[in-house]
Amino acid sequence: MAIKKSNKAALSQAASLKQILKRCSSLGKKNQGNCYFNDVPKGHFPVYVGQHRSRYVVPISWLDHHEFQSLLQLAEEEFGFEHEMGLTIPCDEVVFRSLISMFR
């Protein structure tokens, strides 16, 4: 029985990540004429972090990291994913840089 529950949790998490990817990729399509999205390589997406909204282009593989998923959940709760300002992560930039240094 525990196996079924963990499989359901994994499927639910995979579905959530798929939705996030869809939203991120649709941001790029909506703003193709915008120079901000021309420099985003395939397999990456831009996020905006901190008080000054510093822009980071991050690999999609980071969506597998629990810590990054937690940041995305905070972003969804605070801003939602469907706003004009891009995917904004409500996190201090120093904390974000420290976190992503662990992913590399």
Swiss-Prot record:
Domain of life according to the entry: Eukaryota
Q: Which signals induce this protein? A: Induced by auxin in an ABP1-dependent manner. Triggered by brassinosteroids, including brassinolide (BL). Accumulates in reduced red/far-red light ration (R:FR) conditions mimicking shaded conditions. Repressed by abscisic acid. Induced by light.
- Protein topology in the membrane: Peripheral membrane protein
Q: Does the keyword Magnesium apply?
A: no
- Is Repressor there in the keyword field? no
Q: Which terms in the GO cellular component ontology are assigned?
A: plasma membrane
Tissue expression per record:
Expressed in etiolated hypocotyls, petioles, leaves and flowers.
Q: Which InterPro entries match?
A: SAUR_fam
- Signal peptide boundaries: none
Q: Which Pfam families match?
A: Auxin_inducible
Q: Where in the cell is it found?
A: Cell membrane
Q: What UniProt keywords are attached to this protein's entry?
A: Cell membrane, Developmental protein, Growth regulation, Membrane
Q: Name one GO biological process term.
A: response to auxin
The family line of this record is: Belongs to the ARG7 family.
Q: According to its UniProt entry, what is the function of this protein?
A: Provide a mechanistic link between auxin and plasma membrane H(+)-ATPases (PM H(+)-ATPases, e.g. AHA1 and AHA2), and triggers PM H(+)-ATPases activity by promoting phosphorylation of their C-terminal autoinhibitory domain as a result of PP2C-D subfamily of type 2C phosphatases inhibition, thus leading to the acidification of the apoplast and the facilitation of solutes and water uptake to drive cell expansion. Triggers plant growth probably by promoting cell elongation. Regulates branch angles and bending. Probably involved in light intensity mediated root development.
Q: How does it assemble?
A: Interacts with and inhibits PP2C-D subfamily of type 2C phosphatases such as PP2C67/PP2C-D1.
User: What is the recorded name of this protein?
Assistant: Protein SMALL AUXIN UP-REGULATED RNA 9
Write down the species.
Answer: Arabidopsis thaliana (Mouse-ear cress)
